Regions:
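Membrane-helix boundary/interfacial segments in multi-pass membrane proteins
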Residues: 47, 120-132, 254-259, 289-341, ...
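Periplasmic/ER-lumenal interhelical loops and adjacent helix-loop junctions
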Residues: 46-47, 195, 203-279, 464, ...
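Membrane-embedded helix bundles of polyisoprenyl
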Residues: 18, 85-98, 103-186, 191-209, ...
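Hydrophobic, aromatic-rich transmembrane alpha-helices
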Residues: 193, 245, 261-296, 347, ...
C-alpha cells in the first residue's frame, strides 16, 4: 500500500519537473516580475516601509534572511518548483479525502488539473513565483481545515498555521489562504481559527501598511491595464473559467493565443462539469465549489464597463485596495474545487480498470492541449547569468551603503544577456544593502500606470535634466548606477554623470559616487523595529508550524512501523 501511496506525489513531482526543468541549469530566475540575485538584504523596501506599498512582504524579508545561507538563485528556483509540486500533491490528497472512491486514478487527474493549466503558465511567464507558492498551499489548507472538524487537541492546528504562513509569502497569498480556509470550514470554531491564524500571517504587511510612509491609493489607469482579458474564442468569462485570462497578453503561452485555446478549455470544463455534478449529488466540497464559481464570475464582471468603474472608485478612494486591480489572480481560488471535481469525474466510470483508462485519457488530453507549459513554458523561462561587473558594483555599494539611483530610470529592463525580448524588473534593488530610489511607474499595454515613488520620480526628473550632484545628495542619493544596453529615456543625464567620480565601469554597467553630505531618507528606527517584529511573528508561525508538522509526521510513521501512506502532519481523524 505504501508504494501505491507514493504514486500521486511522484506523479506531481514529474509534472512540476517537466515545467521547471530549464531552471535546473546554473543561473538566476529573471523574467518580468521574478527577480533573483545572489544576495538580498533587509532594506526599508524589503520590510515594506519605503515609499512603495508593501506588495512583496514578507517575501523579500524571507529571501534576505535565507540568502545568508543559500544562494538566492538556488533558493527562488527551489521554492518555485516546490510550489508547483505542492499544488499537485496537495490536490491529490484533497481528492483522496473528499472522493476516496476515485482512488489513485482520481488523484492523478486532480494533480494534473492543479499543475497543468493556463493559470500556472501565465503566472510563470509574468514571474509570479511567490504567488504560485501560495497557490500550491491552497489544497493543503482546505485538507487541513476539513480534518480539523473532529480534532480535539491544539496541536492539530499546527499544520494549518504552517500552510497559511507559507501561502502568506505575499499579501495576495494570505487572502487566498483565508478564503479557501473559510470555504472549507463548516463550524464557527474552525472559521475563527482560520481567521486568527491568517491575521497573524498577515502581520508583516498589515503593520508595514499601517506604519509606512503612506498607503497610496491606486492609479485609475492600472484598473484597465490589469483587468482580466479575453483569449481567442473564449470571451472573458470562458477564459477565466478555463483558468486563463491573464491581463498581460505577452505573458501567455503560444497555445492560448489562437483558437487552440478553445480545445484545452473544452476538455477541462467537461471534466470539471462531470465531476461537479457528482460532488453536488454527494453534497461534497460545496464550499470550495462556491468560491470557484465566485472566482470566475466576479473577475469577469469586474472586467466589464460598470465593473471597471466600480474597481476604479474602490482603488482610488480607498488606500490599500490596489490588491484588487489584478482580477485574474483570484482565479487561483477555483483550483481546489476544479481538482476535486476532476477526481470525482472518474467515479462516473464504474469499473476500476475503466477508471484508470478514463483518468489516463483525461490527463493526456489536458497535457497535450496545453503542450507549451512544458520545459519552462515553451523555453521562455530559463536561468540567466549576470555579467561579472554587476557583482563588482554591488560590492562597492554594500561596502558603503547609501541610496542608489539607476539609469535608465524605467522600472522594467531588457538586457541582451537576459531572457530574449522579455522585459524584467530591475534586479539591482534586491542585490544591494542600500535602498534604490525609483518611481515605480509602469507602461502596460499602452497605459501609463503611476507608481508609489514620489521621491524616486523627483530624482528621475533631476537626472533627466542633468542636475548638479548636490541636488541628488539633497534627496539622499549617494550612488548612481548606469546600466548599458537596456532601453530607456536618459535625456541629458550625462551632464550629471560627468560631474561625478567613477567608482567602476565596464561594458555592461558603471557606478558613480555622489559626494555628500546626504539628506537621510531612511525609515525611523522605531518603525523598522515594529515591522521587523511583525515579520518575526510570521517567522515564528512558520517555524513552529513546520516543526510541529515534522514531529507529528515522525510520530505517525513510528507508530505505524513506517508503513503508513505518506501525509503531512494531519490530525488523527480523516473525517
Amino acid at each position: 500500500m505504501r508504494r501505491i501511496g507514493l504514486i500521486p506525489p511522484l506523479y506531481a513531482l514529474a509534472l512540476a519537473a517537466a515545467v521547471t526543468a530549464p531552471l535546473a541549469a546554473p543561473g538566476y530566475l529573471l523574467i518580468r516580475d521574478a527577480v533573483s540575485t545572489p544576495r538580498s538584504y533587509v532594506t526599508d523596501a524589503a520590510l515594506g516601509v519605503g515609499e512603495a506599498a508593501p506588495r512583496a512582504v514578507p517575501q523579500d524579508f524571507f529571501i534576505a534572511v535565507m540568502t545568508v545561507l543559500v544562494d538566492g538563485g538556488v533558493l527562488v528556483k527551489m521554492l518555485l518548483a516546490l510550489g508547483l509540486w505542492l499544488a499537485g500533491w496537495g490536490a491529490a490528497r484533497l481528492a483522496a479525502q473528499l472522493v476516496p472512491a476515485a482512488g489513485i486514478p482520481g488523484e492523478l487527474v486532480a494533480a494534473t488539473i492543479a499543475i497543468w493549466n493556463p493559470y500556472v503558465a501565465e503566472r510563470l511567464l509574468q514571474g509570479h513565483w511567490s504567488l504560485l507558492v501560495g497557490y500550491g498551499c491552497l489544497p493543503w489548507i482546505a485538507l487541513t481545515v476539513i480534518r480539523l472538524r473532529t480534532a480535539t487537541n491544539l496541536g492539530a492546528w499546527c499544520p494549518l498555521a504552517f500552510w497559511i504562513a507559507v501561502a502568506g509569502l505575499t499579501p495576495t497569498g494570505t487572502v487566498l489562504a483565508l478564503i479557501v480556509g473559510l470555504a472549507a470550514a463548516t463550524d464557527r470554531r474552525s472559521r475563527v481559527g482560520v481567521l486568527a491564524i491568517s491575521v497573524l500571517a498577515a502581520m508583516p504587511w498589515l503593520v508595514a501598511s499601517g506604519l509606512g510612509a503612506a498607503v497610496p491609493a491606486g492609479d485609475a489607469a492600472g484598473v484597465h491595464a490589469f483587468a482580466a482579458r479575453a483569449e481567442p474564442g473564449l470571451g472573458t468569462l470562458g477564459s477565466l473559467a478555463s483558468l486563463g485570462g491573464m491581463w498581460n497578453a505577452s505573458a501567455v503561452p503560444a497555445s492560448r493565443t489562437t483558437l487552440f485555446a478553445l480545445v484545452f478549455s473544452v476538455v477541462l470544463l467537461i471534466v470539471v462539469a462531470v465531476g461537479a455534478a457528482v460532488l453536488w449529488r454527494a453534497r461534497k466540497a460545496l464550499g470550495l465549489l462556491g468560491i470557484a464559481v465566485a472566482a470566475v464570475i466576479i473577475p469577469a464582471l469586474l472586467a466589464t464597463g460598470p465593473g471597471l468603474t466600480l474597481t476604479t472608485w474602490l482603488i482610488t478612494e480607498v488606500p490599500g485596495l490596489g490588491i484588487l486591480r489584478d482580477g485574474q489572480k483570484w482565479v487561483a481560488l477555483a483550483m481546489p474545487a476544479y481538482a476535486v471535481a476532476g477526481a470525482a469525474a472518474v467515479i462516473a466510470v464504474r469499473e476500476r480498470s475503466s477508471q484508470y483508462l478514463a483518468a489516463g485519457l483525461a490527463c493526456a488530453a489536458l497535457i497535450f492541449t496545453l503542450p507549451d507549459l512544458a520545459w519552462g513554458v515553451g523555453g521562455r523561462m530559463t536561468a540567466v547569468k549576470y555579467p561579472s561587473g554587476w557583482n563588482a558594483v554591488a560590492a562597492h555599494i554594500n561596502a558603503d551603503p547609501h541610496p542608489v539611483a539607476v539609469l535608465p530610470p524605467e522600472t522594467m529592463r531588457q538586457y541582451p544577456w537576459g531572457p530574449s525580448s522579455i522585459p524584467v524588473l530591475d534586479p539591482f534593488p534586491r542585490w544591494i544593502r542600500a535602498d534604490t530610489v525609483s518611481s515605480g511607474d509602469l507602461r502596460v499595454d499602452g497605459h501609463d500606470v503611476r507608481g508609489d515613488g514620489t521621491r524616486g520620480r523627483q530624482v528621475e526628473e533631476l537626472l533627466r535634466a542633468g542636475a548638479a550632484p548636490r541636488e541628488l545628495a539633497a534627496h539622499g542619493v549617494g550612488w548612481v548606477v548606469a546600466q548599458a544596453d537596456t532601453p530607456g529615456q536618459q535625456a541629458v543625464s550625462s551632464k550629471t554623470l560627468a560631474q561625478l567620480d567613477t567608482a567602476y565601469r565596464d561594458g555592461d554597467i558603471a557606478l558613480y559616487r555622489v559626494p555628500g553630505p546626504w539628506n537621510p531618507i531612511a525609515a525611523p528606527p522605531g518603525r523598522r523595529a515594529a515591522v521587523i517584529a511583525a515579520h518575526l511573528v510570521w517567522i515564528a508561525l512558520l517555524a513552529a508550524g513546520g516543526v510541529a508538522v515534522l514531529r507529528r509526521q515522525h510520530t505517525r510513521q513510528v507508530g505505524s512501523g513506517g508503513t503508513q501512506d505518506p501525509k503531512i502532519c494531519t490530525p488523527d481523524s480523516d473525517n
